UniProtKB/Swiss-Prot annotation:
It is a multi-pass membrane protein. It comes from Saccharomyces cerevisiae (strain ATCC 204508 / S288c). This is Inositol phosphosphingolipids phospholipase C. Keywords: Endoplasmic reticulum, Hydrolase, Lipid metabolism, Magnesium, Membrane, Metal-binding, Mitochondrion, Mitochondrion outer membrane, Sphingolipid metabolism, Transmembrane, Transmembrane helix. Its cofactor is Mg(2+). It is found in: Endoplasmic reticulum membrane; Mitochondrion outer membrane. Responsible for the hydrolysis of the phosphosphingolipids (IPS), inositol phosphorylceramide (IPC), mannosylinositol phosphorylceramide (MIPC), and mannosyldiinositol phosphorylceramide (M(IP)2C). Regulates sphingolipid metabolism in mitochondria, especially the formation of alpha-hydroxylated very long chain phytoceramides. The generated ceramides contribute to the normal function of mitochondria. Also active on sphingomyelin (SM), but this activity is probably not physiologically relevant. Pathway: Lipid metabolism; sphingolipid metabolism. The record marks N233 as: Important for substrate recognition. GO terms for biological process: cellular response to hydroxyurea; ceramide biosynthetic process; regulation of mitotic cell cycle spindle assembly checkpoint; sphingolipid catabolic process. Activated through localization to mitochondria in specific growth phases.
Length: 477
């Protein structure tokens, strides 16, 4: 469906502009020096949990209105406004990647409100109870889409956490920019529920990041400029972050602009300076939903990791820090992250003709870092494998014990019914509870438990294969 804007686009295309340039307006600016087109991204975790997220409808509508250019949000500081300008004027993006869009009605409102400004839209679907919550709004034509579902993604027994039920995934969108094909990989990786231990789910996120890095390499080798965006639930320097940068060959757009930062120094800054200098999108004290956190808990979890061969960061920062006036609350429990990238046009090749792997294996320091990452990953998998095997065993044991208890309850009922008829009700309820819990644990043990263990072993073997290859390379040196 084409509107007046679409007709204007095609009229401008006749004058020699690509569709991307026409749609992108002033953002698609070609630099005389670098001969690069710029494209502006936004990634935002919208906190759209049904029944759980407070003021969900009002917040999601405020987000949609702001993206559409009709916002009445109140800034918390003029320093946080891009270039010190008007909030609405600076919220003009080319591509918007959203996470936690888990209610269809929220998506319908977003899509409708932003249709004229962002005509290319996509909500991704997977999971059991709801989708992965991933969506994209774009001024740039979408060429193709693909959803990769993480095989290792939490446990069905963690019902109150929900990661397994929503089907955490990677939403891949290929954009037709008219300059160079871009593959945007939007994801919301497994959440940590503790800093240490089993509830931290480090192994799950590391396995997800490992799979992620495989996909990134494939797309890079195919000639795409890859951009990974989303709430990756991993701090800078963590194992998942290393897989997505050192292993996959991407760079952190924020670090490309500001350099690597000492997280301990960022933790000691004031909340406002943490946003300005550390881009702490999560757990900031300036976010009303995280006001009870400690200052040193503020961190950066929302990213745009980019292909350094074809992309260069020229601007980046925290966005959507404003509040909804009548509710006096932030629009999400995360702040958004935005970056403007220069794209090297096709034909201006900067990537070596050899594969990504071969190009990187000539950097000995990087090889040693990757080797260390593999060792850490194997240790991480071994640690969690013990937990997975133990849980599978005890859930299976519960299943067989439930069968014995069920038989025993039936036998006991026949004897007690003659002496105390009312006791039959107790034994029937007991049998029902035993049957339900035993069946659930049995299914988790025999179906999920086996699948998870095999998936972990497969990742371990993949890491070992990569490690053996690096060992061969290092021994040759």
């Amino acid at each position: 469906m084409y509107n007046r804007k679409d007709r204007d686009v095609h009229e401008r295309k006749e004058d020699g502009q690509s569709e991307f340039e026409a749609l992108n307006g002033t953002n698609a600016i070609m630099s005389d020096n670098s001969k690069a087109y710029s494209i502006k991204f936004l990634t935002f975790n919208t906190w759209g949990l049904k029944y759980v997220s407070k003021h969900r409808k009002e917040r999601l509508r405020a987000i949609a209105d702001k993206l559409a250019g009709h916002s009445m949000l109140t800034p918390i500081s003029d320093e946080l406004l891009p270039n010190g300008g008007d909030s609405n004027e600076n919220e003009d993006y080319d591509v918007i990647a959203l996470q936690e869009i888990w209610c269809v009605e929220d998506w319908k409102y977003l899509a409708s409100a932003c249709a004229s400004k962002y005509p290319y839209q996509r909500l991704f679907h997977s999971g059991i109870l709801t989708g992965p919550g991933l969506a994209i709004l774009s001024k740039v034509p979408i060429e193709s889409t693909f959803l990769y579902r993480f095989p290792i993604n939490g446990r069905p027994s963690a019902v109150f956490r929900g990661d397994w039920y929503v089907g955490k995934s990677i939403a891949i969108t290929v954009l037709n920019t008219g300059t160079r094909p871009i593959a945007i990989m939007n994801s919301h990786m497994h959440a940590p529920y503790a800093k240490q231990g089993d509830a931290a789910y480090l192994c799950h996120r590391s396995c997800q990041a490992w799979d992620f890095s495989r996909l990134i390499k494939l797309y890079r080798q195919a000639g795409y400029a890859v951009i990974v965006v989303g709430d990756l639930n991993s701090r800078p320097g963590s194992l998942p972050h290393k897989f997505l940068t050192q292993e996959a060959g991407l760079v952190d757009s924020w670090e490309q602009l500001h350099g690597k930062q000492d997280l301990a120094v960022i933790a000691r800054l004031s909340p406002l300076q943490q946003l300005l200098k550390g881009c702490t999108t999560c757990d900031s004290l300036l976010n009303t939903w995280r006001a009870q956190r400690q200052p040193d808990e503020a961190c950066r979890l929302d990213y745009a990791l980019i292909d350094p061969d074809f992309l260069q960061t020229v601007d980046a920062g925290v966005r959507f820090t404003e509040r909804i006036p009548h509710l006096d609350c932030s629009v999400s429990d995360h702040f958004a992250y935005s970056c403007t990238l220069n794209i090297v046009p096709q034909g201006t090749e900067s990537r070596p003709s050899t594969s990504v792997k071969r190009a990187k294996t000539h950097d000995r320091e990087l090889i040693l870092q990757r080797y260390s990452n593999y060792e850490t990953m194997i240790e991480c998998i071994h640690t969690y494998l013990k937990t997975a095997q133990r849980q599978k065993f005890f859930r299976g044991l519960h299943f067989w014990a439930s069968i014995l208890l069920l038989i025993a309850s039936l036998v006991v009922t026949t004897f007690t019914a003659n002496k105390a008829g009312w006791s039959s009700i107790f034994w029937v309820l007991f049998a029902i509870a035993v049957s339900i819990s035993g069946t659930i644990d049995g299914a988790i043990s025999f179906l999920f438990g086996r699948s998870e263990i095999r998936a972990l072993i497969e990742v371990e073997q993949e890491v070992l294969d990569a490690e053996h290859h690096l060992q061969t390379f290092l021994s040759e040196k």
